[in-house]
Amino acid sequence: MLTSHFPLSFAGHRLHIVDFDASSFHEHDLLWLPHHDRLRSAGRKRKAEHLAGRIAAVHALRRWASGVPGIGDKRQPLWPDDLFGSISHCASTALAVISRQRVGVDIEKIMSQHTATELAVIIDSDEPQILQASSLPFPLALTLAFSAKESVYKAFSDRVSLPGFDSAKVTSLTATHISLHLLPAFAATMAERTVRTEWFQRGNSVITLVSALTRWPHDRSAPASILSAIPR
């Protein structure tokens, strides 16, 4: 499969971006993956996306380790001990990031006005006003809300069950970051906390990234991070 890779410094991390041509994918490309048998029943598009994501992950891992991240029983990437990572893909782009802290990354295509109007009904009653106050086009702002929540979930996916969109509320949105207030539906041990997620636009997509403590955030001996407790 034809790919191009380039690294990008963002929010204190090194993102590894892989643009790929899914039409150039061949089944034998998967033989590079130790777990290729697990993908036997996947569709062609899914196989190409998975491969591109793992290529991005291998580039991201080279600073610390070698090899291809495996695949867990919930289809999650398996990272080396003491490392955290995240993979995302959208259309013809995949990206990955590795850190010694919890990290989550997401890429989403910016919604059309029609899609944003349809999906606006599922957000919290306070969120439309916050998104509109940002001065960003509403489709972009709503896409960022979805993407930021996905990034936060990825950072803690081993600790929480799959949360719904209403398990976190947008509290602010600027040209560089979006803040989320976590509710008990996200995880009881993380409720009433605020997460700041960094973002930037790349073409017709947005990329969001959150980095959090390796230890559970209520551990006051841990250093400060993007994830912080709101006043109690």
Swiss-Prot record:
The keyword Magnesium applies. Keywords: Enterobactin biosynthesis, Magnesium, Membrane, Metal-binding, Transferase. It catalyses: apo-[aryl-carrier protein] + CoA = holo-[aryl-carrier protein] + adenosine 3',5'-bisphosphate + H(+); apo-[peptidyl-carrier protein] + CoA = holo-[peptidyl-carrier protein] + adenosine 3',5'-bisphosphate + H(+). Its cofactor is Mg(2+). It is found in: Membrane. One of its GO terms (cellular component) is enterobactin synthetase complex. Its main location: membrane. It comes from the Bacteria. Pathway: Siderophore biosynthesis; enterobactin biosynthesis. InterPro entries: 4-PPantetheinyl_Trfase_dom (IPR008278), 4-PPantetheinyl_Trfase_dom_sf (IPR037143), 4PPT_N (IPR041354), Enbac_synth_compD-like (IPR003542). Mg(2+) binds at residues 106, 108, 150. SUPFAM superfamilies: 4'-phosphopantetheinyl transferase (SSF56214). Its EC number is 2.7.8.-. It is an enzyme of class 2 (transferase). GO terms for molecular function: holo-[acyl-carrier-protein] synthase activity; magnesium ion binding. GO terms for biological process: enterobactin biosynthetic process. Belongs to the P-Pant transferase superfamily. EntD family. EntB, EntD, EntE, and EntF form a multienzyme complex called enterobactin synthase. PANTHER family: ENTEROBACTIN SYNTHASE COMPONENT D (PTHR38096:SF1). Involved in the biosynthesis of the siderophore enterobactin (enterochelin), which is a macrocyclic trimeric lactone of N-(2,3-dihydroxybenzoyl)-serine. The serine trilactone serves as a scaffolding for the three catechol functionalities that provide hexadentate coordination for the tightly ligated iron(2+) atoms. This is Enterobactin synthase component D.
